[in-house]
């Protein structure tokens, strides 16, 4: 069965050749976040994270502005090793990745390896070995690690043997890989529903006391947002179901409800969540 290899946001570039760059300017501190990102921090933990964070604003900001922001941020930080040419290559790669279509017959190892190799081959078409390591090094290693774990599950080992072999293999990996696996296990355990104290203690073990406290605050903020949003949806539904209102009146009342219920920086996010709640 024909199946798209990866689910990613297709970047609406129009013609990839129509990417223009503004003249160089002196480095300057500037808030490069779009309106919908004002409740987040700029993700510059890695070159790829920053590129994807920047591209997520496409639609709110023109591509030319995003390009200038990427270059300006690199000049300010001096750590990401990004320039106009590399950014343009990344745009072309993302489009090619979105178009990547290969034959997937299931979740067997051969199919997964085929997908993994197709991604590596595509990266080599656009980037040098040094650039691949800079942008995709961690992602590629984690994907290879997932393949290794899948191989173990198909080799007839008992559950306990698989766990021990996996721990041995993981111990040989870089620290960031081990942390990633630990976080994945934590999220899986949390999804199964543990009491708050057990959850907190596991977080302390994985990310330290300060990290666990930050995660707890995030949980509280997320729960509060969910509560407010669900109440908002109930009120919005009542407006939509009111037969005495015209479509224009409904639109105005919902807009007023949205703007009085949430901060301005959240409005675009709320509109997107409304579309999801409405089924698209």
Swiss-Prot record:
Keyword flag Cell inner membrane: yes
Subcellular location: Cell inner membrane
GO molecular function: unfolded protein binding
Domain of life: Bacteria
Keywords associated with the record: Cell inner membrane, Cell membrane, Chaperone, Lipid degradation, Lipid metabolism, Membrane, Transmembrane, Transmembrane helix
Single GO biological process annotation from the record: protein folding
Keyword Protease set for record: no
Transmembrane segments: 5-22
InterPro entries to which the protein is assigned, alphabetical: Lipase_chaperone (IPR004961)
Membrane topology, from the record: Single-pass membrane protein
One of the record's GO cellular component terms: plasma membrane
Recorded family membership: Belongs to the lipase chaperone family.
Reported function: May be involved in the folding of the extracellular lipase during its passage through the periplasm.
Protein name, per record: Lipase chaperone
Protein species of origin: Vibrio vulnificus (strain CMCP6)
